[in-house]
Amino acid sequence: MKIYWLFLLLATIICFWNESSARITWNGTRYQRKAYWSQAIIFFAVVIFFCGLRSGIADTGTYIQMFKGYPSSISGMDLKSVNKDKGFFVISVLFKQFISNDFHGWLFLITLISGVALMIGLMRYSEYFGLSCYLLIASTMFTYFVNGMRQFIVVTIFFCATYMILEGKWTQYVILILLLSTIHGSALILLLVYFLRNVKPWGAKMRTVIFLSLIVGVCFDKLFPLFGNFLAETQYK
């Protein structure tokens, strides 16, 4: 709990600091508020440091046991025995062989990648960087650094690479999503996001998507068992 209050205090300071010193820059199409990199580095350095040095929060214990069970060298890898997330497995084995067998370093590296990707994404796309930092802590969304870290690293890298969607870089986007799907298979659903880039807000297509989403939400109790049966024989059973 003390760490949470520390994060919240830091986020509040960054928020006020950013509001009092934000720069107004021209990004080629419009004026945009921009934070200073020093603010971003200070905030995320603290968050990454404490989250990266954890050893027993949420599902961290499961990941630690998973890491300990991985082979310590490439020669010991058997990809045929890995049913899911082979990219994550390979990265972990490479870490054990070339960097360290200590899970602390492994957890810190994953936290570092997630944190840097999130920081870059917020610096690129957030008009109110300080407020974004505050909401990250106040809403407890920062806990994804320590719970569900495979999903979170996929989400943060995707967020950082949003420019591929905005600039229509289809080939690069597909390659990235396919690579991310080797870390967590659910990343494949992000391929659909690309096709929403040209959908006009509140246009016919967008209203259709919203309508279908509402139907799924209302019928969730009936659809969930069917979805569970569909996944019964997959890696997410």
Language-model features: where?
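Short acidic/glycine- and proline-prone juxtamembrane loop motifs at membrane-interface regions
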Residues: 146-152
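Membrane-interface alpha helices of multi-pass inner-membrane proteins
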Residues: 141, 172-195
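Short hydrophobic/aromatic helix or loop-helix immediately within or flanking a transmembrane segment
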Residues: 61-72, 78-100
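Loop-to-helix entry region of an early transmembrane alpha helix in multi-pass inner-membrane enzymes
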Residues: 86, 98-113
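Transmembrane-helix signature of polytopic, membrane-embedded enzymes
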Residues: 119-139
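Alpha-helical transmembrane segments and terminal signal-anchor/GPI-anchor hydrophobic tails
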Residues: 61-64, 89, 194-237
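Transmembrane signal-anchor helices characteristic of membrane glycosylation enzymes that use polyprenol
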Residues: 1-4, 12-23, 30-58, 217-218
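Membrane-interface transmembrane helices that cradle and orient dolichyl/undecaprenyl
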Residues: 158-172
